[in-house]
Amino acid sequence: MSKSSIYGLTYEKLKDWLIEHGEKRFRAEQVWNWLYKKRINSFDEMNNVNQSAIQLLKDNFVLHTMGEEIRQESQDGTIKFLFKLEDGNLIETVLMRFHYGLSVCVTTQVGCNIGCTFCASGLLRKSRDLSSGEVVEQIMNVQKHLDERGEKDRVSHIVVMGIGEPFDNYNNLMDFLYTVNDDRGLNIGARHITVSTSGLAHKIYEFADDPIQVNLAISLHAPNDELRTKIMKINRAFPIDKLMKSVDYYLQKKNRRITYEYIMLDDVNDHKKEAIELANLIKNHRHLAYVNLIPYNTVDEHIDYRRSKSENIQAFYETLTELGINCGVRWENGADIDAACGQLRSKQIKKSKAV
């Protein structure tokens, strides 16, 4: 049986585990500091921890559960990493550079079962969930890459928008969030972390009840059930009415802004009537709503879909703003590399099968 990732333990779980195995309470703080502040690559680097404790950790945990398979760097500084896991599966992680800091997009599952008809991630069905340690390790790998390049900046923002549905891996997601948010370690502010869901309403209720104050984004992509079901199979299980009731509960509990993600598909969901429907759908909580219009990244396997024309994106944006909806257009990072979610992984798997 393979050893677990040390990054899979929250601070409290690490402390409890060490005490259970005969170590003093302070040992957790020492180890945590080495993991997240000094970012060690070997347990042997912990020079203020006794050898018996180091051996205990080495016998039960590992620091590395994945290796870098491919790295693509864009002219705009975006870096896409393809990591190979211990079981041979591939996942993607993306570093994006913004004026406000460095943001990392992490993956939570190997493959995806949500079934969005326009997305590269769903071309390969979900084979398993990632452990919380595997999600944390993505952040650590990116930060260590920056350290090795001599970059002094640290990862300041996280978006959980990579391959998979985060709320379908809920417990591991929450351990990940508490680990990266912990002020004794990476200390990434909750307001700098965004979790995106395709709309698992029952998990939105659960997320609303959790005290952590991270941001929520909903991949909406259509303002009515007929169209949303056509492009997102998840809408059969969680139609818009059920989804919006969970949103109401979330807003009541958190009083925090929700971002609605809306992919712009040419002649599919980009007409004025959809803009009006969308505005009407969220008008009752528009003071806590923001719409992110996302120009579509073309995927070879989905030839039926094209990016909306620039003038249609602009018209959609103007209609929403005229109706009092806060919105913006999110132009992609890494346009010259395989930066659309799932593209690089899909290409590499196809290439491997062709050999």
Swiss-Prot record:
**Enzyme Commission code(s) on record:** 2.1.1.192
Q: Which cofactor does it need?
A: [4Fe-4S] cluster
Residues annotated as binding S-adenosyl-L-methionine: G164, E165, S196, S219, L220, H221, N297
- Active-site residues, record numbering mapped to chain: E92, C341
* Domain named Radical SAM core: residues: 98-330
Tell me how the cofactor is bound.
Binds 1 [4Fe-4S] cluster. The cluster is coordinated with 3 cysteines and an exchangeable S-adenosyl-L-methionine.
**Compartments reported by the entry:** Cytoplasm
Keyword hit for Metal-binding: yes
Iron among keywords: yes
Report the domain of life of the source organism. Answer: Bacteria
Q: Which cysteines are joined by disulfide bonds?
A: C105-C341
| Sequence positions that bind [4Fe-4S] cluster | C112, C116, C119
Biological processes annotated in GO: rRNA base methylation; tRNA methylation
Q: Which UniProt keywords apply?
A: 4Fe-4S, Cytoplasm, Disulfide bond, Iron, Iron-sulfur, Metal-binding, Methyltransferase, rRNA processing, S-adenosyl-L-methionine, Transferase, tRNA processing
Could you state one GO cellular component term attached to this entry? cytoplasm
Give the main location: cytoplasm
Report the catalytic activity: adenosine(2503) in 23S rRNA + 2 reduced [2Fe-2S]-[ferredoxin] + 2 S-adenosyl-L-methionine = 2-methyladenosine(2503) in 23S rRNA + 5'-deoxyadenosine + L-methionine + 2 oxidized [2Fe-2S]-[ferredoxin] + S-adenosyl-L-homocysteine; adenosine(37) in tRNA + 2 reduced [2Fe-2S]-[ferredoxin] + 2 S-adenosyl-L-methionine = 2-methyladenosine(37) in tRNA + 5'-deoxyadenosine + L-methionine + 2 oxidized [2Fe-2S]-[ferredoxin] + S-adenosyl-L-homocysteine
Q: Which GO terms describe its molecular function?
A: 4 iron, 4 sulfur cluster binding; metal ion binding; rRNA (adenine(2503)-C2-)-methyltransferase activity; rRNA binding; tRNA (adenine(37)-C2)-methyltransferase activity; tRNA binding
PROSITE patterns this protein is in? RADICAL_SAM
NCBIfam families per UniProt: rRNA_mod_RlmN
Give the miscellaneous note.
Answer: Reaction proceeds by a ping-pong mechanism involving intermediate methylation of a conserved cysteine residue.
Function statement? Specifically methylates position 2 of adenine 2503 in 23S rRNA and position 2 of adenine 37 in tRNAs.
Question: Would you identify the family this protein belongs to, as annotated?
Answer: Belongs to the radical SAM superfamily. RlmN family.
Indicate what this protein is called per its UniProt record: Probable dual-specificity RNA methyltransferase RlmN
Q: Which organism is this entry from?
A: Oceanobacillus iheyensis (strain DSM 14371 / CIP 107618 / JCM 11309 / KCTC 3954 / HTE831)
Q: What is the lineage of its organism?
A: Bacteria, Bacillati, Bacillota, Bacilli, Bacillales
